[in-house]
């Protein structure tokens, strides 16, 4: 299982490097993760695994886009969120941040500022559960000025 996860992640990373400007890349990326069928009416499992993301729809300064990611998932020894990853496939640097957690972390929570290229893009946030795999949500954002 760990080997398969590594191979899947490595292959996805290779595609991310090779095709960052591909217009259908968001659809390709979305297929690699579990997502909510209906974000406005999530199941209990989806509510536990899909992160809550606070990101303004319009950011004035692309060099300092505030983002908060949190999860209500329990952090138990045998079932917890291993990591949160923030990505934007429209930017030269795709991975905006990645944080790792253990059950001793207490909660999977990230509050930071990320750099975004100017214009419109989609920010992906992925929570990786040690039992149920990777769960993703995306937020559209428009950068009014600046950017990386």
Model-derived regions: residue spans:
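Extracellular Ig-like/FN3 beta-sandwich strand-entry sites
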Residues: 118-122
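Exposed aromatic-hydrophobic patches
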Residues: 109-115
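Beta-strand signatures of extracellular beta-sandwich domains
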Residues: 83-87
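Short edge beta-strand/loop segments characteristic of extracellular beta-sandwich folds
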Residues: 66-74
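C-terminal segment of N-terminal export signals and the immediately downstream linker at the start
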Residues: 20-53
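Short acidic/polar inter-strand loop motif in beta-rich domains
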Residues: 130-136
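N-terminal secretory signal peptides and thylakoid transit peptides that target proteins
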Residues: 1-15
């Amino acid at each position: 299982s760990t080997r398969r996860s590594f191979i899947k992640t490595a292959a996805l990373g290779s595609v991310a490097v090779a095709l960052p400007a591909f217009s259908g890349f968001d659809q390709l990326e979305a297929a690699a993760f579990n997502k909510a069928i209906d974000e406005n009416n999530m199941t209990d499992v989806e509510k536990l695994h899909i992160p809550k993301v606070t990101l303004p729809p319009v950011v004035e300064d692309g060099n300092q886009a505030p983002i908060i990611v949190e999860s209500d998932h329990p952090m138990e020894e045998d079932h917890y969120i291993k990591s949160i990853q923030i990505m934007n496939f429209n930017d030269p640097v795709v991975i905006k941040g990645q944080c790792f957690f253990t059950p001793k972390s207490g909660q999977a929570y990230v509050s930071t500022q990320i750099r975004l290229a100017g214009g419109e893009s989609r920010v992906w946030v992925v929570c990786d559960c040690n039992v149920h795999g990777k769960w993703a949500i995306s937020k559209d954002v428009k950068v009014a000025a600046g950017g990386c």
